[in-house]
């Protein structure tokens, strides 16, 4: 039984201009036509197995001085710290920020709602402040909390 595209010929094996096998069937012409799209000839540049770099050199912020005259690649943590405000501080400086609320006494006494809650087993305390605005934390604030030395 013959299928579509087969017209009683026998299969022959040929190679194209790049040495790849090209199988044709029957006596159909193998040029343009018959649904075949010819690719434009491309010139392959041979480098004899040697990788060559371009003469262009550009400065990149993905590496920094390692202190010994060489360069080293920055980690993802260092790149994130660079983008955050205050992230360009030296690694030796550990600044801790304290969030305090000062209340001033009015005619009826202090108006702030600062409370300290004992955590029990660990003996520490956790400060909670009830803000009138109830402002939610943004993504950047959440990331800042997770970075060491930012509290």
UniProtKB/Swiss-Prot annotation:
Disulfide bonds: none annotated. Keywords: Stress response. Induction: By abscisic acid (ABA) and water stress. It holds the Pfam family Dehydrin. Belongs to the plant dehydrin family. It comes from the Eukaryota. This is Dehydrin Rab16D. One of its GO terms (cellular component) is cytosol. Transmembrane segments: none annotated. GO terms for biological process: cold acclimation; response to abscisic acid; response to water deprivation. Residues 90-105, 117-132 have a biased composition (Low complexity). It comes from Oryza sativa subsp. indica (Rice). Residues 1-138 are annotated as: Disordered. Residues 39-51 have a biased composition (Basic and acidic residues). PANTHER family: DEHYDRIN RAB16D (PTHR33346:SF37), DEHYDRIN XERO 2-RELATED (PTHR33346). InterPro entries: Dehydrin, Dehydrin_CS.
């Amino acid at each position: 039984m013959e299928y579509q595209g087969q017209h009683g010929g026998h299969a022959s094996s040929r190679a194209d201009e790049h040495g790849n096998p090209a199988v044709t069937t029957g006596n159909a012409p193998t040029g343009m036509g018959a649904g075949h799209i010819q690719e434009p000839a491309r010139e392959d540049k041979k480098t004899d197995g040697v990788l060559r770099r371009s003469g262009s050199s550009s400065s990149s912020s993905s590496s920094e001085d390692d202190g010994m005259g060489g360069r080293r690649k920055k980690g993802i943590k260092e790149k994130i710290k660079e983008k955050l405000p205050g992230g360009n501080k030296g690694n030796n400086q550990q600044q801790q920020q304290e969030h305090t609320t000062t209340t001033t006494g009015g005619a009826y006494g202090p108006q702030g709602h600062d409370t300290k809650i004992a955590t029990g087993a660990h003996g520490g305390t956790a400060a909670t402040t009830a803000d009138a605005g109830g402002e939610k934390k943004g993504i950047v604030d959440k990331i800042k909390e997770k970075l060491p030395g930012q509290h």
